[in-house]
Amino acid sequence: MAYEKNNGIVAVQPSGTSTWTKIPLKYIKVEEYKVTPDMMLDLDSYRQETGVLWRHVLDHKVTKIEFTTPHLYETDVTALLTIIQNGYTNTKSHRGKIRYYNPYTQSYKEATVYVPDIEFNINHIDEDKGTILYNPIRIAFIEY
């Protein structure tokens, strides 16, 4: 299966539902969208005194998805955060479920992820209009 417009590049499953809410591309700088699917995990890997690496690669693989938004006004930031936060099954740990397009398999996969802290940097405040414009924001989904 290839990329499907209706599924989007990444979607969030609202908590308690079986539906998906795709993250609209208007919130993603597509050229800065990064997916690292099926990353290997090591446990207690080490180098010998000769410099030879001994790896203990686990069977479990994880995916990391990162993207940057374009400059967004506060209303768009709120809309994007609502999509993401509606997917939290645990608000304390920012845990939720996503569906994403995996380039390795050319198919969609589901993952239980957490969203690391998000940093907001203001570009401009228009006091007359009462608007805030934010610089690009980095969003990440990291699989458990």
Residue ranges and their predicted role:
Residues 1-144:
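Extracellular/virion structural assembly segments
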